[in-house]
Amino acid sequence: MPVPRRVLGLSLALLSLVASPAVAAEREGCPGLVASGPAYLKQATLVERPGTAGSFLDRAARPEGQVGLTFVGHATFLVESPKGVRIATDYSESTRPAAPPDVATMNKAHGTHYSLRPDPRIKHVLRGWNPAGGPAHHDLQVEDVHIRNVSTNIRDWGGGTEYDGNSIFVFETAQLCIAHLGHLHHTLGPYHLRKLGRVDVLLVPVDGGYTLETFDMMEVLKAINAPLMVPMHFFGPSTLQRFLAAAREHFPVEFSPQASITLSRETLPQSPKILVLPGH
């Protein structure tokens, strides 16, 4: 259901007017983490892990400084911290890991991004919207992971704006800042970029219509400038290839043979690139 570009542009312009001009300086650090070193350290060496997306991954501790990332499907990733904390993004009835995570994040734009009946064994269910109204606010520590959110707006079903209906969730662990854009419906102004801080790994919806048109998503990617960007929320090869055709004008593109990879601060790319994990 493609929509006109920049349908929320007016509200974003107003946010930009009140935002601090010192955005770049504030984004040098990842809030809540010490990040005094250079943004990029050396060329990435992605360590593949056996298994398929959504397979059972036990809660064994990982080597210090290493974070597991598995593309389960649609907008759901499984993030595993060095101490074994397991986080499922945009956890829903249709797409979820085989074993219950410790933390589940959700967004409300469509039913494929949230669950009305999350597994009761999940210790922390974090909704990207506030059922009582206003923005959701999450700021919690789960062992070695700091989790927070940045609220954004969504289109309502009448074509208007539902304020604070989506959250960009940020997971900070092992000196990495991993941001999941959720069901993003508008570009990001200085206010959002300041709240995000430094982003090392960006999980990006690339459908080109239900979320953002591809042109606008490119603007988001360039503004955040994360070393590693991983596509999600595409509905088959044609949707993905349309995004990648536009992305190649700005970033190198690589493909992983495995849906599960290992990330670390030491192996971040020296310059931004897109890595495609198998699945959809």
Model-identified regions with their sequence ranges:
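Alpha-helical transmembrane segments and their juxtamembrane interfaces
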Residues: 15-16, 112, 193
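Metallo-beta-lactamase
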Residues: 21-155, 176-181, 200-204, 237, ...
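Residue-level signal for inorganic ion chemistry
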Residues: 229
